[in-house]
């Protein structure tokens, strides 16, 4: 087995992915610090020839077409989820989602007059594109004439290529 992930490892996962537990044939890494971290034999137990620094293959076909677009792309938070709905194959949200720090912060940010005025003055558009798990709550956020809400299913490659600035939190967007 080869460990191929969808993001960049942020936390110490050596107990989970270490050779004594998984014994992978190889581990694909996407960033130099991540590669160097996985190469620590004392933590993971793998030889360096079994750790491969490849980058993200999904970025190999990206094109660069920057426009005056600022994309705000926060990740989801487990604490905002109540439970998993097996029938609908989705998370249900906590009842007080609109009272959460996450909601208040991002609703305030995308409706901040200073940001809106600066975008208008400089000819920028703003896109709000939260993690697909959060997108079910897009209707909860206040709307304005400058911020466009991108729905689940919008191609990430287009957002990455067309944005001149991407703002995220600790996610790997």
Language-model region placement:
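A donor-sugar binding/catalytic signature common to diverse glycosyltransferases
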Residues: 3, 154-173
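Short, solvent-exposed loop/turn segments at secondary-structure junctions
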Residues: 7-10, 32-35, 57-59, 75-79, ...
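Structural alpha-helical scaffold elements that stabilize or flank donor/cofactor-binding regions
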Residues: 20, 118, 158-160
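Conserved acidic residues
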Residues: 25, 68, 163-164
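Conserved catalytic-core segment of nucleotide-activated headgroup transferases in glycan assembly
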Residues: 57-140
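Nucleotide-activated donor-binding/catalytic signature segment of Leloir-type glycosyltransferases, i.e.
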Residues: 137-152
């Amino acid at each position: 087995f080869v460990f191929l992930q969808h993001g960049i490892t942020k936390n110490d996962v050596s107990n989970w992915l270490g050779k004594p537990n998984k014994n992978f044939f190889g581990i694909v890494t996407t960033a130099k610090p991540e590669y160097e971290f996985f190469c620590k034999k004392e933590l993971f137990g793998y030889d360096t020839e079994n750790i491969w620094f490849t980058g993200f293959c999904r970025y190999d076909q990206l094109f660069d077409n920057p426009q005056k677009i600022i994309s705000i792309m926060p990740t989801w938070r487990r604490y905002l989820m109540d439970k998993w709905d097996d029938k609908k194959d989705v998370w249900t949200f906590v009842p007080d989602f609109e009272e959460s720090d996450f909601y208040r912060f991002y609703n305030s940010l995308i409706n901040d007059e200073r940001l809106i005025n600066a975008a208008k003055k400089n000819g920028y558009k703003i896109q709000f594109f939260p993690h697909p798990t959060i997108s079910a709550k897009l209707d909860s956020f206040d709307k304005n004439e400058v911020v466009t809400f991108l729905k689940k299913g919008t191609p990430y490659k287009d957002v990455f290529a067309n944005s001149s600035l991407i703002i995220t939190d600790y996610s790997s967007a």
